[in-house]
């Protein structure tokens, strides 16, 4: 019975830590870029896009498709970085619990 109570206490602590981590992820920002920095995207680790920056040299009607491709690429770069930031936070939270890799509690 004591083991069960200990597990329940540990689960409650983990839930509290998960909530704090989720709140913290709102404030972790990453930036993805493409085209050598001509297009950049800033987003939170929870993948909420905060800003897109486009160099004025790309604002030409005949370069629209290139610009669109660069925006997609920058979004992908930012998304990958956001995933890494989230995984690092999760690892810090669950590292001592002995959970299998990739369990994904988030």
Curated annotation (Swiss-Prot):
Any one GO molecular function term: DNA binding
- Where is this chain primarily localised? cytoplasm
User: One GO cellular component from the entry?
Assistant: cytosol
Report which residue ranges the record marks as coiled coil: none
Cell location = Cytoplasm, Nucleoid
**Keywords assigned by UniProt, alphabetized:** Cytoplasm, DNA-binding
Q: What family does the database annotate?
A: Belongs to the YbaB/EbfC family.
The role this protein plays is: Binds to DNA and alters its conformation. May be involved in regulation of gene expression, nucleoid organization and DNA protection.
Q: How does it assemble?
A: Homodimer.
Q: What is this protein called?
A: Nucleoid-associated protein Nham_0463
Question: Which species does this protein come from?
Answer: Nitrobacter hamburgensis (strain DSM 10229 / NCIMB 13809 / X14)
Q: What is the lineage of its organism?
A: Bacteria, Pseudomonadati, Pseudomonadota, Alphaproteobacteria, Hyphomicrobiales
